[in-house]
């Protein structure tokens, strides 16, 4: 395996390399693969499961021929090592064909066309989140080249998939997906994945700005973190792996992930698998949408692009958002009536747990892993024994990224990773909040006026308030309370 990949990850041998494709036997039958996916609580790599997929040969050159002349939107980002994440709202965008992308990616200095303003040595390009149904709308037969049915999902193919094509350095900021779990098939090139478990949510400083339904972003650039500003990130449990062609990565529900292309051209195909927990998650997302749109639109109605992710067409009105919320709650109850799992009763019996957590909101940044995991995932499922081995490789936890791999393709001496003199963010604000709450309103004003050193910390912006209101832990409690109130 190429340098930088996990030592325990086996190299995938192309079908036919050691014999005819018919001689290959997949290590897991569809039923077993699905059982693993539905029970596994940690990321893992499936090997030798896609050697007979036609999509195995979908490299960028082939796709450029299939999509000849079709305009695709590329996200353009800087090859830099800032401690600030490159969110989609800060990137530029280019409409181009895959042929034009490949020409630009060859680093031709005299290039003209849509990429002419972007120096290949300074910028990366990423055609991300490209849904098959839109990309191949006139070539639907290609849907059959992807066979998620091999993983126990009959009838699931390219129609439920998205395509990702990127250049060296192209990446997705660290985030978690609100819905489902994820299967990612690496077709061409390698990608470096940095993953963090759900219980690390308090240490990743979640934010909903930029706003995108179903995506909770981290304020941290996890490959070059600002530990003075985000000291709790030291507690995060990083899992890292290099995904190679022919491998399929399983990302469990609510695992945070940062993904970066580490080869000149990468092609990936993924599919989000729906889960039972998504019914409650849709209520949480509807609450989030209502709060974000109401507060951010009121703050600056003329500049929605500053806070709305480009994947969202436009901000929705309060009336529309109310409809979304009511529809999500109704769908939840409809599901409960048809499901053998009485989720409402589970919410009721969990009330005592919720009260205990609410009392510890002040210690949000200090909560133990068990408590935060209960809030983040909402369920405590026993982890079934999984047949790990050469064909199912767990993604290992790494206490620290090796210096050569920090920041992916961009070097770093690691000096910015350690801040010995940084203040403890969680304890500082919790103590300050307790002190303020014990005083009268006038005393608070006098304290703020007399202590200029606390002014930057006591100023609360709309985004500061939003980060608290739509924190995944908070919206889950709100969703539970809404449903309890309708079911009593």
Swiss-Prot record:
One of its GO terms (molecular function) is 2-oxoglutarate-dependent dioxygenase activity. Keywords: Chromosomal rearrangement, Cytoplasm. Residues 369-379 have a biased composition (Polar residues). GO terms for cellular component: cytoplasm. Residues 124-288 form the JmjC domain. Widely expressed. Interacts with CRYAB and HSPB1. Residues 88-208 are annotated as: Interaction with HSPB1. This is HSPB1-associated protein 1. Gene3D superfamilies: Cupin. May play a role in cellular stress response. Residues 369-415 are annotated as: Disordered. PANTHER family: HSPB1-ASSOCIATED PROTEIN 1, HYPOXIA-INDUCIBLE FACTOR 1 ALPHA INHIBITOR-RELATED. InterPro entries: Cupin_8, HSPB1-associated_protein_1, JmjC_dom. It is linked to A chromosomal aberration involving HSPBAP1 has been found in a family with renal carcinoma. Translocation t(2;3)(q35;q21) with the putative pseudogene DIRC3. Produces a hybrid mRNA encoding a truncated HSPBAP1 lacking the first 36 amino acids. It is found in: Cytoplasm.
